[in-house]
A protein has these predicted regions:
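Solvent-exposed interhelical
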Residues: 96
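Extended, alpha-helix-rich binding/interface surfaces that flank or overlap catalytic cores
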Residues: 101
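Membrane-anchoring alpha-helices and their flanking helix-loop junctions
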Residues: 1-93, 105-145, 149-174
Length: 174
């Protein structure tokens, strides 16, 4: 039993380390590398403090949303975002009350903000590619697996909560 617990902790630590590296190191590095290869003048906007500030706010909003989802996965779902150690409980509170995939929304917002901060057209393109891949993964892999694992509870959840972007007026469950 202790080996399984240690394995779970190692997977959890590696997951968080990979998320950190992907967000703060790998994505800007890949964006800048692609900019150097394909764009002679890789500036999205003219130098503007307002663009920098707004982009930074969008990025930190995405980071905050991503961190919130990880905390909710750990505390309420008793698991991690890693499919090797998934939540045991269906998580439908916190940010999941408004979006079935707030972690994806947070990751997209972070990349989008990062692309503005670094003024990287390639990073903006990677953000869009990230969104497309997450959409396909969600529809074709995640949702069928969650329907199998959680059955009618998940189906009811899908009926009341939008897949990605929250609506201004949530449907009333009662």
């Amino acid at each position: 039993m202790e080996v399984a617990v240690k394995r779970k902790h190692v997977i959890e630590i590696v997951t968080y380390l990979m998320v950190f590296l992907a967000m703060w190191v790998i994505s800007p590095w890949v964006g800048k590398l692609l900019d150097r290869l394909y764009y002679p003048s890789p500036r999205l906007f003219s130098d503007s403090f307002v663009i920098f500030l707004v982009s930074g706010m969008v990025g930190f909003l995405g980071l905050g949303l991503t961190m919130w989802t990880i905390v909710v996965f750990k505390t309420i779902g008793k698991g991690t975002p890693n499919p090797k150690v998934p939540p045991i409980e269906l998580v439908i509170s916190g940010p999941y009350k408004y979006s079935r995939n707030p972690m994806a929304v947070g990751g997209f917002l972070f990349l989008l903000g990062e692309s503005g901060v670094y003024q990287s057209p390639s990073l903006a393109g990677l953000a869009v590619l990230f969104a497309v891949i997450l959409y396909l993964n969600t529809v074709h892999i995640e949702e069928p697996q969650l329907k199998k694992r959680f059955g009618q509870s998940y189906e009811r959840y899908c009926e009341t909560v939008p897949r990605f972007l929250p609506t201004l007026f949530q449907r009333d469950e009662g």
